[in-house]
Amino acid sequence: STVYEEQFTTPEWFKGGIMYQIFQDRFKKSDKYKAKKAANEEIRYRHDEWDELPQSSITHENYKAQDFYLGNLKGIEEELEHFKALNVNCIYLNPIMESPDNHRYSTADYFNVDPYLGTNEDFKKLCAKFRNNGIEIILDGVFSHTGDDSIYFNKQGHYDSVGAYNSTESPYYPWFSFMEFPDTYHSWWGFTNLPTVNKLEPSYMKFINDPKTGVLPFWQHLGIGGWRLDVADEFPDEFLDAL
């Protein structure tokens, strides 16, 4: 059985609807947007042709999810009529925030769309256009870990920030757990490019939840209909209650 608070409700638009999930990099590349240079451009592999093999399939080196085929937000917007024909009323986007990996579960910047996908303004327009056509946008909330190549950890030094990896005096240092600083730390299922966060660290909870400056309200003000919470089973109840 499911236990929930009596006042808990779900959005009316979500009930009985059809959800369509999109992995942006491989959905559609529109010529109306040209991918901008990323902070970690040097480690990304841009593909000019949509049907090219991933670089790791050519080199046979250890796979890294850094092949980019440059699917973008404009490509999604151009398929509005396709979604309407399918009676879709909700689109769930895999992570869109800046990340060095094509899956974008290794967040580098929680407040900006990845420059290969588009801009924050592009995303705001997408949300508004789709909502006006009866389709809500849900974002993937990746809050159990960040990327090591990020503003917050900055292991590769691609950002101007003092990340947790760079100094114990970093404002982000309390977010992470180091066994031996700086190279041995807790990471999501042992993937060292995904350092896990201390989910009940007050500064981190404020970063995510603060009504004025937090990650959640930032994207909600851009027009999303809701969130899908990644690995929700790995969060303490106190964090979930605060969302």
Spans of model-derived segments:
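Conserved beta-strand positions in the central sheet of alpha/beta enzyme cores
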Residues: 92, 138, 228-230
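Mature N-terminal segment immediately following signal peptide/propeptide cleavage
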Residues: 16-23
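Substrate-binding/active-site clefts of carbohydrate-active enzymes
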Residues: 24-89, 96-222, 243
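Short, charged, solvent-exposed linker or helix-capping segments at domain edges/interfaces
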Residues: 11, 15-16, 32-35
